[in-house]
């Protein structure tokens, strides 16, 4: 239990990929899953609360329905497979955890449940109560109703968002690969990266966009995106191989993405968000001011795009096109556009009412 022991990680999120749970024929790898349940029980007895983000519903449902391409030939096939497979998946989890004396609970979430603040808080409260009761939540995206436009798209990022909602200190992404390499691990001389202190352009360049199994949807790009979200919320994230028995109780080789520091709940939620309703483009002076801890003033904004209301999440973009921050708008889109580049006196004339202190206040903003 060397990775994220209970003493330093009271709450742990474990994500399990489809290729680990389901064999190429679409059947559950029950013996392997029984070992995972034993690992979770061992950690629970040591005082750790564990939640599982479990893939596999589409793969299981596709087999039962006889759908081609693992149920991914169309969105409708994937939704039907997910609806069918979720029952089978939850039943298996309940059985293997029950054999260890643990109670399983199912939580199906959509992107909106974790992107909209009120729904996020509700989901977080449910998750917290389940964990405090000693229950093992089994979480998955509700693929039976989600569409391409309103879905996470992979369970790696979902696991990171769940970690944030649960205030977990650690996330383990169990996969068919044992971590990050400086190039495709199939190439000669590929070097395994054990510890990542900062996710920069060089780390992102190492990501492989493919999924080795052909069964899931999360390649290394999605795992690095998940690490960004988890680290911003103060949680460390490890990518580890699940191609061994009882991977949570062995010192399996892994890549660890280290969280720099904790984050406030609201700022962690902002940083982890996957969607923004609009964007503000700002000049170089405004970028410097934000880095220095200032709020975003209208005078530093050069362009406004998107349709948004007051309180919506906005991306804040520098002159080079890079997203430098994210925050909650103090204005609806039309009013924000009306005061672009203006000082305070000119803003009041343009709006017809006294302007707010900033377009995005520093208390409602996080640097990226």
From Swiss-Prot:
Protein localization: Cytoplasm
Domain of life: Bacteria
Signal peptide (residue range): none
Pathway recorded for this protein: Amino-acid biosynthesis; L-proline biosynthesis; L-glutamate 5-semialdehyde from L-glutamate: step 1/2
Keyword Transferase: yes
Residue sites binding ATP per the record: 15, 175-176, 217-223
Domain annotation PUA: ranges: 277-354
InterPro entries, A to Z: AceGlu_kinase-like_sf, Asp/Glu/Uridylate_kinase, Glu/AcGlu_kinase, Glu_5kinase, Glu_5kinase/COase_Synthase, Glutamate_5-kinase_CS, PUA, PUA-like_sf
EC numbers: 2.7.2.11
CDD domains linked: PUA_G5K (cd21157)
Residues that, per the record, bind substrate: 55, 143, 155
GO MF, any single term: glutamate 5-kinase activity
GO cellular component, one term: cytosol
Keywords associated with the record: Amino-acid biosynthesis, ATP-binding, Cytoplasm, Kinase, Nucleotide-binding, Proline biosynthesis, Transferase
Gene3D superfamilies, A to Z: Acetylglutamate kinase-like (3.40.1160.10), PUA domain (2.30.130.10)
Family from the record: Belongs to the glutamate 5-kinase family.
Main function: Catalyzes the transfer of a phosphate group to glutamate to form L-glutamate 5-phosphate.
Name the record gives this protein: Glutamate 5-kinase
Lineage: Bacteria, Pseudomonadati, Pseudomonadota, Alphaproteobacteria, Sphingomonadales
């Amino acid at each position: 239990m060397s990775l994220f022991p209970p003493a330093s990680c009271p709450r742990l999120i474990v994500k399990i990929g489809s290729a680990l749970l389901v064999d190429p024929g679409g059947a559950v790898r029950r013996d392997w899953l029984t070992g995972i349940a034993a690992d979770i029980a061992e950690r629970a007895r040591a005082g750790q609360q564990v939640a599982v983000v479990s893939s596999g519903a589409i793969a299981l449902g596709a087999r039962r329905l006889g759908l081609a391409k693992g149920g991914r030939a169309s969105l409708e096939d994937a939704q039907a497979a997910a609806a069918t497979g979720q029952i089978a998946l939850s039943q298996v989890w309940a059985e293997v955890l029950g054999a260890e004396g643990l109670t399983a609970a199912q939580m199906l979430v959509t992107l909106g449940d974790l992107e909209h603040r009120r729904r996020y808080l509700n989901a977080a409260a449910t998750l917290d109560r389940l964990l405090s009761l000693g229950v093992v939540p089994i979480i998955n995206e509700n693929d039976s109703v989600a569409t391409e436009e309103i879905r996470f798209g992979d369970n790696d990022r979902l696991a990171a968002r769940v970690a944030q909602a649960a205030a977990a200190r650690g996330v383990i992404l169990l996969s068919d690969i044992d971590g990050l390499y400086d190039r495709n691990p199939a190439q000669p001389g590929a070097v395994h990266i054990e510890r990542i202190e900062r996710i920069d352009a060089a780390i992102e360049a190492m990501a492989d966009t493919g999924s080795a199994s052909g069964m899931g949807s999360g390649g290394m790009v999605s795992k690095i995106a998940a690490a960004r979200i988890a680290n911003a919320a103060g949680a460390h994230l490890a990518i580890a191989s699940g191609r061994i028995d009882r991977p949570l109780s062995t010192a399996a080789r892994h890549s660890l993405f280290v969280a720099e520091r904790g984050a406030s709940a609201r700022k962690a939620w902002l940083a982890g968000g996957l969607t923004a309703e609009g964007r503000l483009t700002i000049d170089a002076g405004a970028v410097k001011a934000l880095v220095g801890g200032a709020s975003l003033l209208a005078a530093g904004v050069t362009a406004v795009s998107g349709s948004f209301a007051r309180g919506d999440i906005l991306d804040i973009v520098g002159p080079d096109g890079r997203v430098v921050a994210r925050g909650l708008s103090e204005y609806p889109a039309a009013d924000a556009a009306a005061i672009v580049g203006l000082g305070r006196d000119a803003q009041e004339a343009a709006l017809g009412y006294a302007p707010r202190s900033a377009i995005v206040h520093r208390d409602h903003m996080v640097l990226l």
